[in-house]
From Swiss-Prot:
Positions with a binding annotation for GTP: 59-62
Keyword Nucleotide-binding: yes
Gene Ontology MF term list: ATP binding; GTP binding
Keyword terms of this UniProt record: ATP-binding, GTP-binding, Nucleotide-binding
Gene source species: Acinetobacter baylyi (strain ATCC 33305 / BD413 / ADP1)
Taxon lineage: Bacteria, Pseudomonadati, Pseudomonadota, Gammaproteobacteria, Moraxellales
Protein name: Nucleotide-binding protein ACIAD3059
Length: 283
C-alpha cells in the first residue's frame, strides 16, 4: 500500500464530504472504525488486496483511551505505507449553525450538555490526532466544491476530467454510454478501396487516404474545436468522465482515424482513454 490518509476533525466540519471526494479520486474509503481496530484492518487489506490508496475516517466516537493511543496506531500504520492525517476544523459559530440547520445531534450530545460544550469537549479529545495532522483545512467558509479543490491542492492530486474517446460502427448499434456522438459516415470510405480494406484507421495507408479529403480535415477541425472549447466547462462542472463516441459504418476506418487524431490533439491537456469497440470485427 502506497498511501494511507486518516481523515478526521470536528463533527460537522465535512469529514463525510472529504471521504466522498477521496473515493471519487480512487481511494478505498472506510469510515467510523474504532482507532484500535485500524492497524489490524489495514494489515489485512494490505495482505489480501492490491490497494494503493486508502482513506480512513476517524471521529470522536472512538474511546478516550483509543485517542490517547493514537501515536502508537500511527506508527503501526506506517508499516504499510506513507501516512498523512487530514484534520478538518470549523469555527464554533459555523458548527452551531450547521448542527441547527441539519437538526442532527452532536456525537457527544447529552441532556446535560449544550452544543457549545460538546464542541469544546470534542476539540480536547481530538488533540492527540490534531498534533499529528499533516494537512489542516478550515472548512468554515467552504462549500463541498471548495473542499474538493482544497484537498486536491493539498494532496497534489490531479482533478483532470478523464476523456473517453470511442470509435464504433453504426451497424453494430450506437453506444449507450456516450455523452456525445459524432457521425462521420459521410467521409470518404476506405472500405471500397480493395487495397485499403484490410487496414484500420490506425494504419498509414488509411491515414493518407483520409487526410487527402478536405471533408475529413474540416470534420476533424469542427469536432476538435468543439471539445477544446467545452471540455474545460464540463470539468468545471465537476464531471469526472466524458465519453465521446465517433461512428462510421463498420467502426474500422473513418471513426478509428478520427479518434486517434483527436487523442493526439488533446492528450497534452486531458487524461484520455481510447476504446475501439469494433476491433474484434476488423478484417
Amino acid at each position: 500500500m502506497k498511501r494511507i490518509l486518516i481523515v478526521t476533525g470536528q463533527s460537522g466540519s465535512g469529514k463525510s464530504s472529504a471521504l466522498q471526494v477521496l473515493e471519487d479520486l480512487g481511494y478505498y474509503c472506510i469510515d467510523n472504525l474504532p482507532l484500535a481496530l485500524l492497524p489490524e484492518i489495514v494489515a489485512k487489506l494490505d495482505h489480501e488486496n492490491n490497494l494503493e490508496q486508502l482513506a480512513l475516517g476517524v471521529d470522536v466516537r472512538s474511546t478516550r483511551a483509543d485517542m490517547q493511543e493514537f501515536d502508537l496506531v500511527f506508527e503501526q500504520l506506517q508499516k504499510h505505507g506513507t501516512v498523512d492525517v487530514i484534520y478538518l476544523t470549523t469555527q464554533d459559530q459555523e458548527l452551531i449553525a450547521r448542527f441547527s440547520a441539519s437538526r442532527r445531534p452532536h456525537p457527544l450530545a447529552s441532556r446535560f450538555k449544550s452544543l457549545n460544550e460538546c464542541i469544546q469537549e470534542e476539540k480536547q479529545l481530538l488533540l492527540p490526532i490534531q498534533f499529528r495532522s499533516t494537512v489542516h483545512i478550515d472548512t468554515t467558509d467552504k462549500s463541498v466544491h471548495d473542499l474538493k479543490h482544497t484537498l486536491l491542492s493539498k494532496l497534489g492530486q490531479s482533478d483532470k476530467l478523464i476523456l473517453i474517446l470511442q470509435s464504433f460502427g453504426y451497424k453494430h448499434g450506437i453506444p449507450l454510454d456516450a455523452d456525445y456522438v459524432f457521425d462521420v459516415r459521410h467521409l470518404p470510405n476506405p472500405h471500397w478501396d480493395l487495397e485499403l480494406r484490410r487496414f484500420s484507421g490506425l494504419d498509414e495507408p488509411v491515414r493518407r487516404f483520409l487526410e487527402s479529403s478536405d471533408q475529413t480535415n474540416e470534420m476533424f477541425d469542427d469536432i476538435f474545436h468543439f471539445l477544446d472549447k467545452w471540455l474545460p466547462v464540463f470539468a468545471e462542472g465537476h464531471r469526472h468522465y466524458m465519453t465521446v463516441s465517433i461512428g462510421c459504418t463498420g467502426g474500422q476506418h473513418r471513426s478509428v482515424y478520427i479518434v486517434d487524431r483527436l487523442k493526439k490533439a488533446l492528450e497534452a491537456k486531458w487524461s484520455i482513454q481510447v476504446l475501439h469497440r469494433e476491433m474484434k470485427h476488423w478484417s
